[in-house]
Each structure stands twice: as structure tokens, then as C-alpha cells.
Amino acid sequence: MSTETASGPTEDQVEILEYNFNKVNKHPDPTTLCLIAAEAGLSEEETQKWFKQRLAQWRRSEGLPSECRSVTD
């Protein structure tokens, strides 16, 4: 029986995503994102959405704006 709900990834999937976010890369390129998605058993779209939301959460925790603009803006 799966613990996955329509609201998001399972605990095991989050563990994989968090490991990659914290230890590998906060901004994975498309190839890396595809590999992370395959490892977690999620779609690339779900994985990309998770990374975008997690990055915004991390930026807020660091006292940075959730969306980063270019230094030339």
C-alpha cells in the first residue's frame, strides 16, 4: 500500500529530493533533474516543481527573496 497522496511525494521520495538539493545541487540542469526524477520515481515536471518550491523555501530561510533577480536589474 502506497503512502503517496495527490498532494505530493512520499517520505522516501522527499528523502531522495532533499539529499540531492542539499548535497548535490540546488539548481540541477535538465539532465540531472531527469536522473533525480528517475531515482525518486517522479515525473520531471513534479521534480522540477519540487525543486522550485524548495529553493524558494530555502531562500526565505536564508533571509533572501524567494525569487532572485539579476544583479543588473
Swiss-Prot record:
Keywords: Cytoplasm, Developmental protein, Homeobox, Nucleus, Repressor, Transcription, Transcription regulation
Membrane-crossing residue ranges in chain numbering: none
UniProt-listed SMART domains: HOX
Superkingdom in the source lineage: Eukaryota
InterPro entries linked: HD (IPR001356), Homeodomain-like_sf (IPR009057), HOPX (IPR039162)
Biological process according to GO: chaperone-mediated protein complex assembly; heart development; lung alveolus development; negative regulation of cell differentiation; negative regulation of transcription by RNA polymerase II; positive regulation of gap junction assembly; positive regulation of skeletal muscle tissue regeneration; positive regulation of striated muscle cell differentiation
Protein name (database record): Homeodomain-only protein
Record organism: Bos taurus
